[in-house]
Regions:
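Flexible, surface-exposed loop/gating regions in the mature catalytic domains
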Residues: 61-62, 83
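Basic/polar, cationic surfaces and motifs that engage anionic cell-wall
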Residues: 1-11, 15, 48-52, 68-71, ...
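Short, conserved "active-site rim" segments that organize catalytic pockets and cofactor/ligand binding
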Residues: 1-60
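Ligand-binding face of N-terminal immunoglobulin V-set domains in extracellular IgSF glycoproteins
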Residues: 75
Length: 152
């Protein structure tokens, strides 16, 4: 939990990589360094196998959403594009479970926060609506965040 910044937004991003392509946390780091960032711009990265990699400390602003970095936590999941390069919910069951647990933890730490996807990110799939952490009862289905299982 971060005591130095007021967090009111949790943004869910995708790596905008094809479902058939692996994109490791090392490759994400190299990509962000090549773009001139000092490190990975997200606070957390979730790979296809459901591993949650802490990246940037929550106490530091991210580099994932211009104009929102100062008061947000950025989560990125590996994937987001189908085999043809079109936006799709490509999250594995392991990613969905990991995201659910991470969001439960973040919503405990930041109960006033809203959860959303970047509104100006055509590369990531649609379907993540904005909702408040207080409205989330993680035992129930939330089609806002996921596909066939209808759970985050």
């Amino acid at each position: 939990m971060n005591k130095n910044r007021k967090i009111n937004l949790i943004l869910i991003h995708c790596s905008a990589t094809r479902v058939t392509q692996d994109f490791t946390v090392g490759e994400l780091e190299a990509c962000h360094l090549a773009r001139g960032f000092r490190d990975i711009g997200y606070h957390y990265y979730i790979t296809k196998d459901g591993v949650i990699y802490p990246c940037r400390p929550e106490s530091e602003p991210g580099a994932h959403a211009r104009h929102y970095n100062a008061h947000s936590i950025g989560i990125c999941y590996e994937g987001g594009l189908d085999a043809n390069g079109r936006p799709a919910d490509t999250r594995t069951l392991a990613q969905k479970a990991a995201m659910r647990e991470l969001l439960k933890s973040l919503c405990t730490d930041y109960p006033e926060a809203e959860i959303s996807r970047p509104q100006r990110s055509p590369r990531c799939p649609q379907g993540v609506s904005m909702f408040r952490c207080q409205e989330v009862a993680f035992q129930h289905p939330f089609p806002h965040l996921v596909s066939s299982s209808h759970q985050i």
